[in-house]
Amino acid sequence: MSMYGRDPWGGPLEICHDSATDDDRSRNLDLDRGALSRTLDETQQSWLLAGPGDQGRKKKKYVDLGCLVVSRKLFVWTVGVLLAAAVFAGLVAGIAKAIPRHHRPPPPPDDFTVALRKALMFFNAQKSGKLPKNNNVHWRGNSCMKDGLSDPAVGRSLVGGYYDAGDAVKFNFPAAFSMTLLSWSVIEYSAKYEAVGELGHIRDTIKWGADYFLKTFNSTADTIDRVVMQVGSGATSPGSTQPNDHYCWMRPEDIDYPRPVVECHACSDLAAEMAASLAAASIVFKDNKAYSQKLVHGATTLFKFARQNRGRYSAGGSDAAKFYNSTSYWDEFVWGGSWMYLATGNSSYLQLATHPKLAKHAGAYWGGPDYGVFSWDNKLTGAQVLLSRLRLFLSPGYPYEEILRTFHNQTSIIMCSYLPIFKSFNRTKGGLIQLNHGRPQPLQYVVNAAFLASLYGDYLEAADTPGWYCGPHFYPIETLRNFARTQIEYILGKNPLKMSYVVGYGNRYPKRVHHRGASIPKNGVHYGCKGGWKWRETKKPNPNIIVGAMVAGPDRHDGFKDVRKNYNYTEATLAGNAGLVAALVALSGEGHGVDKNTMFSAVPPMFPSPPPPPAPWKP
């Protein structure tokens, strides 16, 4: 199959060529036009045969315009009228320019753009370490400036990164997924980010995460034997009074208890996700060659470690198993391998990501109730959409075509499962899809599905494909966008409670977010480990508004409890907000669509290898 494939809707894609050759054009230019014999018409004969007197008389009465002969008087009158009209038009134009104008103001931003700007602010509120001057969250300050250094087993700086949610733990697994998702959205929709003035903001957000990840392993080495998976502790055993990030309720700026560092030596899922994060970021920062190459090197080292040291990062019984348990690492191999290929152009990564046995281990053929649910734990659906992009736009052909076609077909089926007509997932009476089957904290899964649906619709449009099939039924692209739009509109307030689940958006939103920094006033008072409990227990609204935070969401009956202690309703997370940002930018504005080429900036042309030269001829 060729690099570009065939037009799926019929007709060749070849550009028509001019039938005349360069030699033909050259010979035509060499011809002496004056030497050609031809018959003169009657008008030309009259010019040659008429005497001097005859020509003089005709010039006085008529003007020859080539295609016709007109009266000289009529010609002069017509020219005069045209000149007068031109002068008049010039005067009118000059007067119009001199009159002051009232320019029509640009249209107000749409709801999705307004929400996008707010959702990005959440990441500013979650930053750890020494904050930049333009952080713009007045109630936040420098925090946890001794991370890593205070742990004698580590002895190096792990300052920076992001707090995961309402506590002060830094979990690398969901944080890396969050940064991968943000980078993906920038690669696809950089024009939209730039149009609303947020491109620099989100690039800074991604770089803050990438710079921290580079600290969590030996990023200058080619081979490593460990990766930091967590800073801080959230585990509390019954009756324990040991100060940590869950027992205590303190502003991050006031933390004075030990913050342990947890490393892993066999964690394929974590390392492959971190590799995906750095690889995707390297495409975002391809305009900074040195930094991009630094990210690629780190990603390469991590992915090598992931393959050589098999295991789940949460298998050791750490905090991760309680808060962010990883069920498998095979999906991260497909996901990470895809991003490594796109960042490097090295076909060995694509061969791995499209290996049939790897797809089988990742659950590509299993189905089941969670099939098609994209999250920090399961990246298979994201990888399927990403590799469908490769097939739609580059069509690499053999030996990748078979598995790419399978992933493409599975992506179509997943998109069908999101539609209410097929009832693959339940919905609340208010219309919210239940991708986690009625369990708590549903919104993080909803925003991811909305992003993928909108993105896949844009892929189809960019490939000049008007829709896709669900069995025998054809659905237009707008069906995908309608699904994504209605789900995000529910989150922004179009729900039975008329409540926005994004803090700071709309007139009614959660006021008691499960968040230490937002719930404790910045009043110059140092509230210790237990001293902050009163702010956790109070029923008063948070003194600080954590703008842009998407809370966990309603229950399966569209109900919501704005209670600080109930994190199943009121806690916001990095992964949830990353999906929200991606979905909002995909739906925002008009036009633009996806950037087809930036994603493939490191991918070499996929022309087939030329055949070997023939052996020398011998008689």
Swiss-Prot record:
EC number(s) per entry: 3.2.1.4
Task: State the UniProt keywords alphabetically.
Answer: Carbohydrate metabolism, Cell wall biogenesis/degradation, Cellulose degradation, Glycoprotein, Glycosidase, Hydrolase, Membrane, Polysaccharide degradation, Signal-anchor, Transmembrane, Transmembrane helix
The protein's matches in InterPro entries, at most eight in alphabetical order, are given as: 6-hairpin_glycosidase_sf, 6hp_glycosidase-like_sf, Glyco_hydro_9, Glyco_hydro_9_Asp/Glu_AS, Glyco_hydro_9_His_AS
Induction: what does the entry report? By gibberellin (GA3) and brassinosteroid.
Q: Which residues lie on this side of the membrane: Cytoplasmic?
A: 1-74
Active-site residues, record numbering mapped to chain: D167, H514, D562, E571
- GO BP, sorted A to Z: cell wall organization; cellulose catabolic process
What are the GO cellular component annotations? membrane
Catalyzed reactions: Endohydrolysis of (1->4)-beta-D-glucosidic linkages in cellulose, lichenin and cereal beta-D-glucans
Disrupted gene: resulting phenotype?
A: Plants are dwarf with reduction in cell elongation and decrease in cellulose content.
Q: Quote the subcellular location field of this record.
A: Membrane
Q: Give the sugar-modified residues.
A: N218, N325, N346, N409, N426, N568
Describe the function of this protein.
Involved in cell wall assembly during cell elongation.
What this protein is called in its record is Endoglucanase 9
Species of provenance: Oryza sativa subsp. japonica
